[in-house]
């Protein structure tokens, strides 16, 4: 999935601003409090519209803190019609979608986001209803500064069987870090390999690679929490 352009209207500190992303890699540079995080939040919500078409992942909506406010002296007045409008493509289809929070305290509508939602629903049905194994799903990763050191130390248990959709998209756009899910998967497949069972993905590599991984986890202190 690719977002080529996004318009932010009454969104955080943007009254009405558009951004284009013409290349495969975009770097945003600016002084503090100039809107870099606001832009990332808008992109996060735009990408999160895809999740509305899936059965299990959490939904993302425009929140009251996303609504632009104007200083009128004694108070800040929230502005109406806070929205993001995005243009992009997924699986070679050009898409345009928009979500709006008409007023503070209302709900984020999705009536203009159906092109992306319906495409997501189709992919979801292929995975969960038709049980197809070769479905090209988009990859989402969101990393904000809030992810740094936001998790306390905790024990990592073996990963039990679950949903491919839920596992893949459960916390993909969460503002907090989640290393537990991936490490559960690594640990479960590592134990499968030790028992001679079939494993998934990159865990099918050599035993030496897995030993190096465990050694590194122990060196960083995470190995003790894996046990």
For each predicted feature, which ranges?
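P-loop NTPase switch/coupling surface
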Residues: 1-187, 198-205, 222
């Amino acid at each position: 999935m690719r977002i080529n352009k996004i318009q932010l209207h009454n969104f955080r500190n943007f009254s009405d601003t558009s951004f284009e992303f013409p290349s495969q890699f975009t770097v945003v540079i600016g002084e503090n409090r100039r809107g870099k995080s606001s832009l990332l939040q808008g992109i996060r919500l735009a990408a999160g519209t895809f999740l509305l078409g899936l059965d299990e992942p959490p939904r993302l909506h425009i929140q009251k803190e996303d609504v632009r406010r104007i200083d009128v002296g004694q108070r800040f007045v929230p502005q109406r019609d806070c929205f993001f409008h995005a243009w992009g493509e997924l699986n070679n289809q050009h898409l345009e979608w928009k979500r709006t929070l008409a007023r503070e305290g209302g709900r984020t509508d999705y009536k203009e986001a159906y092109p992306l939602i319906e495409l997501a629903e189709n992919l979801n049905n292929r995975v969960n209803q038709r049980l197809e194994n070769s479905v090209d799903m988009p990859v989402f990763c969101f990393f904000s500064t809030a992810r740094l050191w936001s998790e306390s130390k905790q024990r990592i248990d073996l990963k039990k069987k679950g949903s491919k959709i839920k596992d893949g998209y459960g916390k993909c756009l969460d503002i907090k870090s989640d290393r537990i899910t991936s490490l559960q998967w690594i640990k479960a497949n590592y134990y499968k390999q030790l028992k001679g069972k079939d494993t998934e993905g990159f865990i099918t590599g050599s035993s030496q690679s897995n030993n190096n991984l465990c050694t590194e986890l122990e060196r960083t202190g995470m190995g003790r929490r894996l046990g």
